[in-house]
Amino acid sequence: MIEIKDITVSEYSEMEDKSEYDFAIDFAFTFQQSKDVYQIGDVTDLPFGVVKDMQDEIENGEMNFVRRCFWIDKIKSKKSGTWIGKEKLINFITGSNYLINEIEKLMNTERIVFTHEPTIEEEAAGLDRFNGLGIYMQLRKLAGNDITKIEAVKQLPYALCFTELYTMKQEYDFQKELNEIYKSKNHD
């Protein structure tokens, strides 16, 4: 039987053989829980750049234990000023699960809200050349195509940026549909 002690993040990090703990982290019900132990609250209040960087790491499969430590420490230290290494491993795992789950919910919402079905003309023109530039394109659009303002945009709350991107998409969709109406009237 595996014996799991109530250790800290630092103690776990310093272990030579983490296999029993890794197994527990991957499969034990206790470690699969998602709790807002760090009182992060609504992740849409986090800076847009933080959310986007986390989304990028999740999408690319880079959200490992070290990166979880980085993000929780970055967010938590702003609130409490304490170092993540002193945290109990179980609290850290369930707290980072909460953060990742909430970021994944935002990713799913974005997929639904911002998905654009390209036209044949857009595909023929090479729309796919913009693949991989998604986050940068969002930042650039929010900065009004002024790349010197991108860092300022990254500091804005995610909720504000999401609302603006949603508004831009609605305006784009409206103009596209309106142009189609005008185009069909001109052909009649």
Which residues does each PLM region occupy?
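An amphipathic, hydrophobic-aromatic interaction surface with interspersed Lys/Arg
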Residues: 1-188
